[in-house]
Amino acid sequence: MKSIFSVLFAFVVVVIACSCISCKSSRKSATEPDTVALVGPTFNADSAYAFCAKQCSFGPRLMNTEAHDKCGEWIMKQFVGYGMKVETQDAELKAWDGTMLRSRNIWARFRPELTTRILLCAHWDSRPWADNDPDSTNWRKPVMGANDGASGVAVMLELARVISSDSTLNIGVDFVCFDAEDYGVPQWSSAPDSQDSWALGAQYWAEHQPQGYEARYGVLLDMVGGEGARFYQESVSKQYASEIVNKVWRTASQIGYGSYFPMQEGGMITDDHVPVNEKAGIACIDIIPFYPDCQQSSFGPTWHTINDTMEHIDRATLKAVGQTMVQILYSEK
């Protein structure tokens, strides 16, 4: 899913690796938050896992396919069932290779009458090509996208389920499922790797906002179910929304999930939050894993491979992210 600002990212990784080793112990004692009591309902990791598996049961959600369209209908039906007001944003978007993509952004609104709103988002399409697979014979095969796609939507669906059954949340929440995120230029192509070839649905959403729409801030959930995932603080997020980064990472530590959210910087990522920040003007962070020691990819060993399947989805990771987001929402004033 994402493209990395490759040269800059490589430099950042080296700098971070060196600096974090030298300052880790002193930084921890200075910034470690106190423990706080849980607020809000319990996030059910088994339910989120089932939502992830259901999306995968349709097959890879590739653009312009029946599996993609059927999964989209199912996602909308789930949000409607939880009492959300659901709208779609349909568009024909031109891909890097000239292919016209039938894109559908799905927007589900909890308590749409409220003006104080938090934006949660994830992409729901899956990558057409396993172009980072260690076996080159798999490079043109589709990716299931259990983590890279389904996991973020699964967490949002479980959040929608638990807040819809609870009457104490007094803010509005917008759940946006972005389409056409993962159709960026493949590594095997001779075409230049344009950053704009990624996050097409999010770009369209950001450029076609309803008049007067505002959100206090946004959180992008990307690849939030993987085994061994750790969510470092992404650089674009810190540039545009450092206060939100601090809030989320501090909250995770306060409720016992600090090991999943290290107080350390990760790379600079091209992802759906970039147009949300730059085009929509909504401060938005990206919760995305960073594997500094993974040779296959800093996004983890299954990223853009045929192994991005349910076998590598971890309920504990879903729980850490989901319960942190419950705490964030129910701590808003």
PLM regions with names:
Residues 25-71, 82, 295-312:
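N-terminal capping segment at the start of a domain
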Residues 62-63, 92-95, 113-114, 124-128, ...:
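Solvent-exposed loop/turn segments at secondary-structure junctions
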Residues 53-113:
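A non-catalytic alpha/beta surface segment that caps or lines the substrate-entry region
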Residues 34-42, 57-66, 93-96, 138-150, ...:
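Second-shell loop/turn segments in exported
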Residues 47-57, 70, 74-81, 151-158, ...:
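Extracytoplasmic/secreted proteins, especially bacterial periplasmic and envelope-associated proteins
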Residues 140-243, 268, 272:
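Acidic/histidine-rich catalytic neighborhood of metal-dependent amide-processing enzymes
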Residues 1-36:
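Bacterial Sec-dependent N-terminal signal peptides
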